[in-house]
């Protein structure tokens, strides 16, 4: 994997994690 692919994968992981936290927070967890 090159640095561009690693950057995109890490960005998607962080983005998905942030969305999950927002959803859980609004669910009242």
Curated annotation (Swiss-Prot):
GO terms for cellular component: chloroplast thylakoid membrane; cytochrome b6f complex. The keyword Nucleotide-binding does not apply. It is a single-pass membrane protein. GO terms for biological process: cytochrome complex assembly; photosynthesis. GO terms for molecular function: electron transporter, transferring electrons within cytochrome b6/f complex of photosystem II activity. Keywords: Chloroplast, Electron transport, Membrane, Photosynthesis, Plastid, Thylakoid, Transmembrane, Transmembrane helix, Transport. It comes from the Eukaryota. The chain crosses the membrane at residues 3-23. It is found in: Plastid, Chloroplast thylakoid membrane. Component of the cytochrome b6-f complex, which mediates electron transfer between photosystem II (PSII) and photosystem I (PSI), cyclic electron flow around PSI, and state transitions. The 4 large subunits of the cytochrome b6-f complex are cytochrome b6, subunit IV (17 kDa polypeptide, PetD), cytochrome f and the Rieske protein, while the 4 small subunits are PetG, PetL, PetM and PetN. The complex functions as a dimer. This is Cytochrome b6-f complex subunit 8.
